[in-house]
């Protein structure tokens, strides 16, 4: 079962699997809420155009195609989490939540219940079974510019055992060439960049439309606790933000922390964004069956952030402490931190808090 978004990547994944001899079924997930019109754009993974494109590709490949309704689950597991995170002063990653709960959670469970051996997606990452370790491993895709392993750190061993990632050994250029060779109409289709369920305006407008009564103004404080002004509500701010603060201090200032207990936005100088230590919750580990006492890793604190050398320490309750060799700028609670050793994904978690040392 191939999760088809109507884009070139998942379409090419379906084509490659059929060519390899698999019996392929294409599915598109209906995710947009009933009270929200489907995204109108050309590239959104949930848009009506996406469904049309996926169906056309399935017809060309001569594979069965279905649209599956995951609206209610998506609203509970992704949209509600997205809104709640911003209200709590965190910056969420809805794509990771969707991968964890929807694609490789509910969709995989449905496929297995139907007797289907694997689900497949168009992610740029590699997975294989390592006999020496007795584990399935996950690694970056060959195309460093398109690598999506960061968004896949939540894989369990059971999920990896029943997942195929056909594009891991290809570059984006090669994928488009393969799609063109198959005569797929999406071979030159632009990529989707937006949050799929935010159909109008930006994410702030979306949160306001769905949780206006929960957004409360509060104080803007400096790092010493002095009141500098008023903010419009925590969801309107994120770590590292400089514009839109409404302050005239005669010097640049940045959001350095969000304090939900005091409903406060904390601002400071650029140097105040630098931190060497983070704490992460809800960690998942792919490379390790048993956790070491500590380990050297490289870590990525945002999807497109460069990796940085660090020492990882396990903590109780699925938490971890990560100490970077050099200070990192704008480490943001709510975002994922993903640990690597070479090309291999060690695992990752959700950034909970930061510290200086």
Curated annotation (Swiss-Prot):
Entry binding sites for ATP: 3-10, 29, 122
Keyword terms: ATP-binding, Cytoplasm, Disulfide bond, Nucleotide-binding, RNA-binding, Transferase, tRNA processing, tRNA-binding
Catalytic activity: S-sulfanyl-L-cysteinyl-[protein] + uridine(34) in tRNA + AH2 + ATP = 2-thiouridine(34) in tRNA + L-cysteinyl-[protein] + A + AMP + diphosphate + H(+)
Location(s), subcellular: Cytoplasm
Positions annotated as active site in the UniProt record: 98 (nucleophile), 196 (cysteine persulfide intermediate)
Primary localization class, coarse: cytoplasm
One Gene Ontology term of the molecular function aspect: tRNA binding
Start and end residues of each stretch annotated as Interaction with tRNA: 146-148, 302-303
Gene3D superfamilies tied to this protein: Adenine nucleotide alpha hydrolases-like domains, HUPs, Translation factors
EC number: 2.8.1.13
Superkingdom per UniProt: Bacteria
Top EC category: transferase
GO biological process, one term: tRNA wobble position uridine thiolation
Disulfide bond residue pairs: 98-196
One of the record's GO cellular component terms: cytoplasm
Site feature: Interaction with tRNA: 123, 335
Any Pfam family matching the protein: tRNA_Me_trans_M
Biological function: Catalyzes the 2-thiolation of uridine at the wobble position (U34) of tRNA, leading to the formation of s(2)U34.
Family affiliation: Belongs to the MnmA/TRMU family.
PANTHER family from the UniProt entry: MITOCHONDRIAL TRNA-SPECIFIC 2-THIOURIDYLASE 1 (PTHR11933:SF5), TRNA 5-METHYLAMINOMETHYL-2-THIOURIDYLATE -METHYLTRANSFERASE (PTHR11933)
Protein name as it appears in the record: tRNA-specific 2-thiouridylase MnmA
Organism: Moorella thermoacetica (strain ATCC 39073 / JCM 9320)
Lineage start: Bacteria, Bacillati, Bacillota, Clostridia, Moorellales
